[in-house]
Amino acid sequence: MLNLKFIIENIEKVIEKLNTRTGDFSYLNKLLVLNIKKKKLIFNIETLRYQQNKISKEISILKQNKTNTENIFERSIFLKNEIHVLENDFKKTDSEISEILNNIPNLPHESVILLSKDNNKINFKKYLSPKKFNFNIKDHVTLGRNLNILDFDRASKITGSRFIVYKGLGARLERSLIQFMMDLHSEKGYIEIIPPFIVNDISMFSTGQLPKFKNDSYRLENSNNWYLNPTGEVPAINLHRNEVLSQKNLPLNYVVFTTCFRQEAGTAGKDTRGILRQHQFNKVELIKFTEPQDSYLELENMLQDAESVLQKLELPYRVIMLPSHELGFSASKTYDIEVWLPGSNNYREISSISNTESFQSLRANIKFYSKNKGKNKYVHTLNGSGLAIGRTLIAILENYQNKDGTITVPKVLRSYMRTDIIK
């Protein structure tokens, strides 16, 4: 969330930055008008309250002197009614301001490329060249079915489309990837977290999922405010909602395992084949709470930590720095890691690493006590997949496939899998 005072004092900069994003931000003009109206209402309410208090004292004196108070009492009633009308108008105006503020996305960082929608993403770096196969390759759907490790038909029977049943060595591979990633990141000092898979509406608002992505979330009908968790950052960031963190504990790093649930609204017809885009999927998420001056250094550290998973798995990938118009709602800067998928002959996103600066901490009221400033300041929060499990599984099946249809298990996973080949 952007601070109203900051927006008003830097309105030209805010408009300029927001116009590099996707969306119509003409409502900022309304915000300015409402803010002026709010100030006038506050002044008028305070003026009338002062008059009412003054009259109340006069009435008290008149009563002591047994003087007629009828006229002045009528004036007091009139002021009370006027104040009531103005207070209702104030509440309505303040609510309209809050609604606008809640829907304003974060501002792009100065290092983010400001590109038009027609420009391509910025290719930041690549790791490994895609393997050249000397046989006709298969995609993960065909491989999974032939090896009887991915069961789409029974998943559809159990639930519906965009769900999967992992079987045999497929289930073991999914589980091995989770354990491998959790082990790898915890060895680097991340604290392991397995949170609830159901979150409330305040948690969803705090990280920016609400109100923006309400239609892409699963809300529990028998509850007024519970949602199925859409991503690990929601419960992890809200671990410290309404808290003041110790400066000596920053940066505070978490590695979070969650099962995530998304409606994938607006993706009808996209990636319907296979497990690339599912309603339910597993993910290992990286979270950082940092001091403001350290957050962009920690963004680079988090990027390296996410990359290390693919490096140890020896999977080809590239890193993209997203231009301003592709940034997520809460993000100020984002790197996408895209893994090579031979089955589709393309790089596909497997992780987004983002710095939200104080955008989420303002919404969640997460601060730290700054000894230098002698006061509480908002932390910066960072999040990123480390990695999406299902997409990592796709990459392994397709990049490690053999001519006979078997899959060579990456060396780093063999102790988890207890085999070196899937057949």
From Swiss-Prot:
Keywords: Aminoacyl-tRNA synthetase, ATP-binding, Cytoplasm, Ligase, Nucleotide-binding, Protein biosynthesis
Catalytic activity: tRNA(Ser) + L-serine + ATP = L-seryl-tRNA(Ser) + AMP + diphosphate + H(+); tRNA(Sec) + L-serine + ATP = L-seryl-tRNA(Sec) + AMP + diphosphate + H(+)
Compartmental location: Cytoplasm
MF term (GO), any: ATP binding
Residues that bind ATP: 262-264, 349-352
GO cellular component terms, semicolon-separated: cytoplasm
One GO term (biological process): seryl-tRNA aminoacylation
This enzyme's EC code(s): 6.1.1.11
Keyword Transferase attributed: no
CDD domains for the chain: SerRS_core
Residues making up the signal peptide according to the UniProt record: none
Pathway field: Aminoacyl-tRNA biosynthesis; selenocysteinyl-tRNA(Sec) biosynthesis; L-seryl-tRNA(Sec) from L-serine and tRNA(Sec): step 1/1
InterPro entries from the UniProt entry: aa-tRNA-synt_IIb, aa-tRNA-synth_II, aa-tRNA-synth_II/BPL/LPL, Ser-tRNA-ligase_type_1, Ser-tRNA-synth_1_N, SerRS_1_N_sf, SerRS_core, tRNA-bd_arm
Ligand binding (L-serine): 231-233, 285, 385
Superkingdom in the source lineage: Bacteria
Annotated function: Catalyzes the attachment of serine to tRNA(Ser). Is also able to aminoacylate tRNA(Sec) with serine, to form the misacylated tRNA L-seryl-tRNA(Sec), which will be further converted into selenocysteinyl-tRNA(Sec).
Entry remark concerning the domains of this protein: Consists of two distinct domains, a catalytic core and a N-terminal extension that is involved in tRNA binding.
Subunit field text: Homodimer. The tRNA molecule binds across the dimer.
Database matches in NCBIfam families: serS
Family indicated by similarity: Belongs to the class-II aminoacyl-tRNA synthetase family. Type-1 seryl-tRNA synthetase subfamily.
Protein name per its UniProtKB record: Serine--tRNA ligase
Species of the source: Phytoplasma mali (strain AT)
Lineage of the organism: Bacteria, Bacillati, Mycoplasmatota, Mollicutes, Acholeplasmatales
Gene name of the record: serS
